[in-house]
Design a protein with these regions (language model features):
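C-terminal functional modules
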Residues: 85, 89-169
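Catalytic-core regions of glycoside hydrolase
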Residues: 1-88
Length: 169
């Protein structure tokens, strides 16, 4: 089994082109995602992305290492199954939204908000990062810039961030 060019990494064509001749066979991929034992204070609930969409013929198998939290892992495992079933047409955002909806149909909008803000493992020894809080990143950047450069608050950005915080709680 091969985890990629690091213990926690995405898998793409160039890494498989490198390792397959060394193995003298197609790699069996053990993807260390959404496992979070290296960042136990984080949940990895965001979209599954970063792996090549053109690698199905360059590997012998693909398995995902889930988090120690079985129920929380279901969002990512749903998307990993979607990805491995049809790589060429895989869309991470669509798959993620379907996973959230199918796993919690009565309250999908709340789970989506929670998951959108719980997707990055944070700084870690594996240097593996994920996007988090994507929808409010421009507002957060504007707030930070205004404060750092002018010691002021960008009121529009503040309102956007405050609204997202209200959704969270």
């Amino acid at each position: 089994m091969w985890t990629g060019d690091m213990v926690v990494a995405t898998i793409d064509k160039s890494t498989l082109d490198f390792v397959n001749p060394l193995l003298k066979r197609k790699a069996y991929i053990w993807w260390n995602f959404p496992v979070s034992d290296y960042v136990q204070d984080h949940l990895l609930l965001g979209p599954v992305y970063g792996n090549g969409l053109d690698i199905k013929d360059d590997m012998s198998a693909f398995v995902s290492n889930p988090m120690e939290h079985a129920e929380a892992s279901k969002i990512s495992l749903y998307s990993v199954a979607d990805y491995t079933w049809n790589m060429e047409n895989y869309d991470s955002e669509t798959s993620w939204k379907h996973a959230v909806r199918d796993l919690m149909p009565l309250h999908a909008e709340y789970l989506e908000i929670f998951a959108a803000h719980n997707s990055d493992p944070g700084q870690n020894g594996h240097r593996f990062r994920r996007e988090e809080s994507v929808a409010i990143q421009p507002a957060l950047s504007a707030l930070l810039k205004a404060y750092q450069e002018k010691n002021e608050i960008d009121e529009d950005a503040y309102r956007q961030v405050a609204e997202e915080c209200r959704k969270i709680i």
